Amino acid sequence: MPGKHQHFQEPEVGCCGKYFLFGFNIVFWVLGALFLAIGLWAWSEKGVLSNISALTDLGGLDPVWLFVVVGGVMSVLGFAGCIGALRENTFLLKFFSVFLGLIFFLELATGILAFVFKDWIRDQLNLFINNNVKAYRDDIDLQNLIDFAQEYWSCCGARGPNDWNLNIYFNCTDLNPSRERCGVPFSCCVRDPAEDVLNTQCGYDVRLKLELEQQGFIHTKGCVGQFEKWLQDNLIVVAGVFVGIALLQIFGICLAQNLVSDIKAVKANW
């Protein structure tokens, strides 16, 4: 009986998963570098890079922080995933998986805690907005962010227009020499659809009027309440976005771990 030769297929690294992970992460890397570059450029324009103490001088949130932090995290993750997949480097791939997994669990924990301690979150959001109201004129990026939020959610202040008493330019004290005294920023104003030119002085002296009179000129609802209402109205969309991000993260972790297993299997046959 003639002898039969058995041929065993040697394990190999899956090219499809490898180059998909590489392509996905190179896009991630480029976007991260772009975010980081925008953040650093903005800081350079504001003189922060030449005076690091300016980072702590601002009473509210500097929106540029968001670009720098998000850009930095995306760049690190993109680099690890991209080079790890291309060079079949198990250390970088494991780093990518662990880092991405850590971010996933932090997001999950944040979501659970936000649901359980929603009253505390509401109080913190109120405090956060009021701190930024105080620093409204201190930074142009912060000013633009607050104006955008108040216009988008048709609100004024954290709980209402009187929160602008916290700002030295808008407070109603007799010692305030500002022309904006007892007023609110233009972003609080109820816009006239027929108005072609934005009236930036529409909020002047408006808080000297009675509350019922104010409603014809400015939005009297607070941004905390309006933000909560927006979340409830768009719950399906918001939940869909977060679920999509979570699934993408899980897919990236599984893809990286599968690639690590393939690389180890190939090395075991050397």
Swiss-Prot record:
GO CC list: plasma membrane
Entry-linked SUPFAM superfamilies: Tetraspanin (SSF48652)
Any one of the GO BP annotations: regulation of membrane protein ectodomain proteolysis
Glycosylation positions in this chain: 51, 171
All ranges on the Extracellular side of the membrane: 41-63, 116-234
InterPro entries: Tetraspanin/Peripherin (IPR018499), Tetraspanin_animals (IPR000301), Tetraspanin_CS (IPR018503), Tetraspanin_EC2_sf (IPR008952)
Keywords: Cell membrane, Disulfide bond, Glycoprotein, Membrane, Transmembrane, Transmembrane helix
Family annotation (Pfam families): Tetraspanin
Subcellular location(s) of the protein: Cell membrane
Topological domain spans for side Cytoplasmic: 1-19, 85-94, 256-270
Top-level taxon: Eukaryota
Membrane-spanning ranges: 20-40, 64-84, 95-115, 235-255
Membrane topology: Multi-pass membrane protein
Cystine connections: 155-223, 156-188, 172-182, 189-202
Job of this protein: Part of TspanC8 subgroup, composed of 6 members that interact with the transmembrane metalloprotease ADAM10. This interaction is required for ADAM10 exit from the endoplasmic reticulum and for enzymatic maturation and trafficking to the cell surface as well as substrate specificity. Different TspanC8/ADAM10 complexes have distinct substrates. Seems to regulate VE-cadherin expression in endothelial cells probably through interaction with ADAM10, promoting leukocyte transmigration.
Similarity comment: family membership: Belongs to the tetraspanin (TM4SF) family.
Assembly and interaction partners: Interacts with ADAM10; the interaction influences ADAM10 substrate specificity, endocytosis and turnover.
UniProt-recorded name of the protein: Tetraspanin-17
